[in-house]
Amino acid sequence: ISACLVGSEMCIRDRDMNRKFKKLGLTCNVGTECEFYLFEKDDRGRPTCIPIDFGGYFDVAPLDAGENLRRDICLTMEQMGMAPQHSHHESGNGQNEIDCRYAGPLKTADNVMTFKQIVRAIAMRNGLHASFLPKPLPQQAGSGLHINLSLYMDGKNLFEGDIAPDSVAGSFMAGVLAHSRELTVFTNPLPNSYQRFGCDEAPRYVSWSRQNRSQL
């Protein structure tokens, strides 16, 4: 099993991706901002649609009922070699967000899967249900998994300053936009995913912007 872990010289996934980036002379870092809801359970232990609180964006206790649970999640993440950076109540009732420090693409992908298992397990231990569904409550904000990408060449962040269309960073963004339909197979695999689009800070247009959160 250890041979399959990112960082091992025998990890085929890691070795193949590193070879491709080295050929291009690039280093890629990926950071995540993962949102989820915490719901109460009924007397039989089944999930309900009742959020654990009625707090809003960046609320604190007592309006934020998930503060201690998020702390347990972050401590567990650190014990498992992950690096949580920020934790706060999101805009939806019972909605939470935990951000993780950037790492390589494969390491980050593995961390996201581990993170979700940690959240579900700790929520269950506290008699709650954690949901990563994009739009669990029609009248509340949807949950996203924001992916922050950076490209480096010779130690320089290629996304700093003005980005020319014919630059490496410009070509990278053009590639993401050109393949946006294909990417939705992985980023939005459920019918429920599309109920989130077009609302609040969810994507609305296939374009890019430095500030507008409704851009893809």
Kindly label every feature range from the protein language model.
Residues R13-K22, T27:
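Structured beta-strand-rich cores of soluble
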Residues P51-M77, P105-K116, M153-L158:
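Acidic, His- and aromatic-enriched active-site or binding-groove loops in soluble protein domains
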Residues V6-S8, N29-P62, E78-A103:
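Residues forming anionic-ligand binding surfaces in small-molecule and nucleic-acid pockets
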Residues D99-P105, R120, M124-L216:
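Loop-rich catalytic cores of soluble enzymes, especially ATP-dependent carboxylate-amine ligases
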Residues R15-R19, L63-I73, M80, R125-G127:
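Noncatalytic alpha-helical scaffold of FAD-dependent oxidoreductases
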Residues V30, E67, R71, G92, ...:
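Conserved structured core elements
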Residues K23-N29, L75-A83, K107-T108, F115-S131, ...:
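Secondary-structure boundary elements
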Residues I1-G7, I12:
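Single conserved hydrophobic/aromatic residue that forms the stacking wall/gate
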